[in-house]
Amino acid sequence: MRDLVRTALERADEKRTNPGAATLLRELSQANVSIHILSGSPEQMRRRLEAKLKLDGIVWDNFTLKPNLQNMLRLRFRALRDQLGYKLPALLTSRTGAGEQVAGVKETLVGDDAEADAFVYSLYADVMEGRAGEELVQRILERGRVYEDVIEAALRSVRLVKPEPVVERILIHLEQQTHPRDFQIFGARVVPFYNYLQAAYVVHEDGRLPATSLLRVAAEMVTLHRFDGDALARSYADVAKRGHLQGTKIEEIVAALPELEKTVASPAREEVRRMVELLPPQAELARARWKPPEGEPMPDYLELVDRHNPRHRKRKKT
């Protein structure tokens, strides 16, 4: 799994964490899911960010930060805000550079609505699947005003791609409360979510997260963020009604509850139990609304790239 970590401005012991995020990352790493962090934060913040991750008990495999100081020294001021020219080449280089050892390995990408994550990750997914070729990628990067040498590096990686479906899901945290319908243009593969329990529901159903781990995320939502059982179940219903859950594996969640109850105190124990009681009817809703991500048309990236170019957005506002 690849995950993105937002810029942290507080000290490590003061940094705010999105509800359920740290627990979900801990549980994923304990489930032997590979965690690769690609952050838009500058390299100078590495110590602070790593301290925060360690404070939360999170183990990661790779941690890539943006070389903003290097960009400034080279007078590359566009690159300071550019996400397309940073994240797409980084993703392509990481995947193609790993060679045969990652053949058949699926990725779940996690980002937020504060940057161009849905756009960049969808494009990356279509490149890896062979739907977006070298010529199209070049036109997109040129239109996005990416520096020429960065374009060349990205295209070298594109030429190394052995087409296969790589990206299973793209999870977008709605940190800025963007409406989920704004992401429909990217298809069902992109899953907008409001809290990390919703992300846990998705990755559990995808087979990446054990049911006991999902329940621990739910328990944290009660203990630290004052969710009750009804709110926990509504989180499932919200994702289900938007067509991102199949309504499977509810039996696993029910079966895992007794084990969780041995280690979780009140009120989390009662609220999680209430959530589990409410999930079966919501699973029926999920089965009725499920939208398979396969076979959807590719987004018009050439049209979309203007929306995600910071300079274009700035001109449009003036």
PLM region spans:
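Asp-based phosphoryl-transfer active-site loop
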Residues: M1-D3, Y121
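Short acidic, glycine/proline-rich loop/turn micro-motifs
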Residues: D3-L9, L73-F77
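Short, acidic loop-to-helix structural element flanking the phosphoryl-transfer center
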Residues: L9-I35, E43, R47, G85
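C-terminal cap/substrate-recognition subdomain and adjoining C-terminal extension
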Residues: P42-T318
